[in-house]
Amino acid sequence: MIQILTGTALLLAVLALFTLFSYKAPHGMKAMGALANAACASFLVEAFHASLFGTQMGITFLQGVGDASGSLGGVAAGILVPLALGVSPAYAVLVGLTVSGYGILPGFIAGYLVSFVVKFLEKKVPAGLDLIVIILVAAPITRGIAMVMDPVVKSTLLQIGTVLIQAQETSPIIMGLILGGLITVVATAPLSSMALTSIIGLTGVPMGIGALAVFGSAFMNYVFFEKMKLGTKKDSIAVAIEPLTQADLISANPIPVYVTNFIGGGLSGIIVAMMGITVSTPGLATQIAGFAVSVAENGMRGFIAAVACAVVSIIAGYIGYFIFKNYKITTADEIRGTQEEVAA
């Protein structure tokens, strides 16, 4: 139990760190938005093509498409974050390519930090020499940062994963509550539930919990975003399909979103654990692919569990609204300057 509490506290600390970064770090919100775009460009493609069309339907070509995209999350983050911070496209690609082979979070951290180095060099080095200097200085620094951060990120994810494994050894209700709650929270955070469940090799009932809890969260987040008026209808649909598309908005409202997701995910997890739904493929903690594989491997029992998870998740969305309806929120307009852009 102590280990479970320790791991849970670690997860909360990581989530708090991302929120602090969004608010206090220079261009934090822009960087988080770029991270969300990188996750969509890599993990979402991987979820559909590799996990669904490749693994489940046996389409080898699409398996390759998904695997290729999923393996380049770090490169995507390393390119998109500098672009968001105002680095010229050529230098942004240069930075991103140097983190090839590393995950999305090491790529994000390296891309963010080196963006300031590149902008400084662009300003101070005479035109014509800046390309050579940036190649000689920024490229090795970028890879060095990614190399240092990679074991830190992996050890953090593995520690969180240990919580999920430890919970499996307790009662089904506790296992479902903790796994469902934590994986659903991770699904809304920049950690990526797909990456987490892949790294720790989650299979069986724990993976079934992750798959259907995240599936249910699509309905819950849509209801919650709509009722709280966090963004437009488009934002609500986007967060239902892939929460990472709204990473900046979620990081700006961490307590309402994470608490609501833990409630819905925990309820879904209990249902899945009690029904014994299993998934044999790790990394399927994603809305559409998780649902499809759960039903494919468990038949009508999996479908019934999915419907039940959707129902309790919708209820959780309303519960979250009633809890936080008077809570001061930060809207998409405030974060992204939508109203100002329209007025201009």
Language-model regions, residue ranges each:
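Pore-lining transmembrane helices
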Residues: 2-342
